[in-house]
């Protein structure tokens, strides 16, 4: 979903990062080596199955689990994380979340935190910067503005209204000024 969304926005230059814990700094992370190994390997496996090129960065994981970050480099700054998917084996247990499996046994789920567009503010700032404010028409809140040149002409105003109705029938967001 992240990459199809990027395609919709024309984002082609990005870098995938597998953010891992630092095993030498265990105080910074949830203390469960088995969980960490399982989660990190699961993300590696998914990335490899998808054929994604990625780098691994030690010490960049969240305290509760590893994550896949998708980073971009804006025109005027350093690389930023736009999207993220985070595996969380820790918090479901802390919140005592359970589900019943097919055998009727209670199990603790794994939570996937994901932000397809990341912080909306950051995403919009990136898109505005990259497009220099020339957003794609499909993204504009008002796609067409109809402005009759003679506002005191009833026939012209009726025609302008007709144009607006035709456009709205085609799911075009239109405004009559």
Stretches found by the model and what they are:
Residues 1-177:
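NTP/phosphate- and nucleic-acid-binding module
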């Amino acid at each position: 979903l992240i990459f199809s969304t990027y395609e919709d926005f024309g984002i082609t230059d990005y870098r995938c990062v597998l953010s891992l814990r630092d095993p030498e700094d265990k105080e910074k992370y949830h203390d469960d080596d088995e969980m960490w190994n399982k989660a990190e390997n699961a993300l590696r496996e998914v990335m490899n199955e998808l054929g994604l090129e990625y780098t691994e960065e030690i010490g960049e994981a969240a305290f509760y689990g590893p994550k896949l970050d998708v980073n971009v480099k804006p025109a005027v700054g350093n690389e930023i994380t736009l999207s993220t998917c985070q595996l969380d084996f820790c918090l479901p247990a802390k919140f005592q979340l359970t589900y019943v499996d097919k055998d009727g046994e209670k199990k603790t789920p794994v939570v996937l935190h994901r932000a397809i567009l990341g912080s909306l503010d950051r995403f919009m700032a990136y898109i505005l910067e990259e497009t220099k404010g020339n957003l794609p028409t499909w993204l504009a809140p008002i796609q067409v503005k109809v402005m009759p040149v003679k506002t005191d002409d009833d026939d012209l105003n009726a025609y302008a209204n007709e144009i607006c109705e035709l456009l709205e029938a085609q799911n075009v967001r239109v405004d009559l000024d």
